[in-house]
Amino acid sequence: MKGTGAGAAQQIFPLMRDTGRAIMLTRGNNTHSGNLALRDPIDRDVFHITASGSQVGALIPSDVVPVRFSRVSWGDGRASTESTIHRKILAIPGAEASIHAHYLSAISVSFDAKEAENFLLYEGDVQGTEEFSFVPIDRTGAWVLGRVPSGTYREPVGSKEMEARIPRYLADSPATLVKGHGPFVRGGSLQECLHLLGIVEASAALLQAARLRGVDTTALARRIRAAGQAAFYPMKVRAFDAAAFGTYDTRDEGTIRAFRERALFNFVQGISPYATGSMSEKITEHEMLYCPTASAPEGFEIAIRRLPIDALEGDDWELVFHKTLYRDTNHKACIITQSPLASAEGLAVLAERYGMDALVRPGSVALDYADSHDHPVVKPIDAEAVYLNPRVGLCRWDAPVAAVLDMLRWHKGACLIAGVGSIGAGKVTLEQAAHHVSSGESIARFRQAVHLTHVLRGGPPLSHYEPATQ
């Protein structure tokens, strides 16, 4: 197609290929599902979209076709069956890219009914079809996504109804769910869309896990929506900024490789969505190397910045925590991740011990973190985790930093923050910190499986498997 330019095409295909592969690696699509779309940076009347029947996780150059906004072009014949939906999404001001994927937890929570409200909040009928809101109950999802419209469609694949409703939802929200079909997101770049998709899936996985563990997630979602995310989760989440990545204040290849390996592992394993969380290493008495993400797929840049340990005006919550850790303890490395299952397990344990008011009305239920023996913990039940650490420290999202530091001291560098994620600290290396956040997700998964077996099949309760520690 004239006007797109060879240079633009050379940039577009690798980015779409890497994005599609990243989604596939995190089980966001089957072999032939989903679609990606991106505005041409030169010819603004053109967008590029994956072809119908292409393998989004293994794209080849001919799988990406150009389509015009203004008129029918040769690309329309090969483009995804949902190309008209993407055409309208990309007409939204500021929308340079859009993605539709089939993430498992996001689709699973969309199977809800107004009589149940197990995962979603019922909003009413739209032309005879039910409409819901997916309200994330975790800090990252609440800040980044807010309310995610979730619609029921008579024809939920490539229909005129979808063409009319999805762009309308995305004009006000970065993401929307199609019942039984999956999320659509829009953003300023494919990188931002991947970031948003990951948060949708992580927040859905957390919501589902917490609900199945007995947490009244509906009450929690209503409370967050009523109070607003800033009041409920005062630790603001930094907005996605592509300019934050690609800067390296070290030339040491071993250091760069270590940070990249941790980011790739966390991404592929679902420990943290792309461009969430953070990592650092203390390198001198007064300085650290700081990476503003704990997660990135192959082909996507991270960043490593050399920063002073002293707090500076404008530091966000995570950066302040890294700096405080190095000033007040002898740890040398730290990783903070969104850890959806661990975060959900933290919510469940707090609800079991203190009641739902501890989550819905945290100001009315004070938690005591001062006693090194009697404070909130999550007890692993799998052999390896018990061997490593028979108790993992647990804090609510409003715990003072000093309490979190105590948990890391008392529990070998491991702490879960209910509604927020996981923190791992290493005495010497980043790998030690990585072990803790990786183990946190496994600990939660095993506990949740045993709980479901107990509830559904009469198996032994969690207490039967928990280590007898004080």
For the regions a language model picked out, list residue spans one by one.
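Glycine-rich flexible loops
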Residues: 1-470
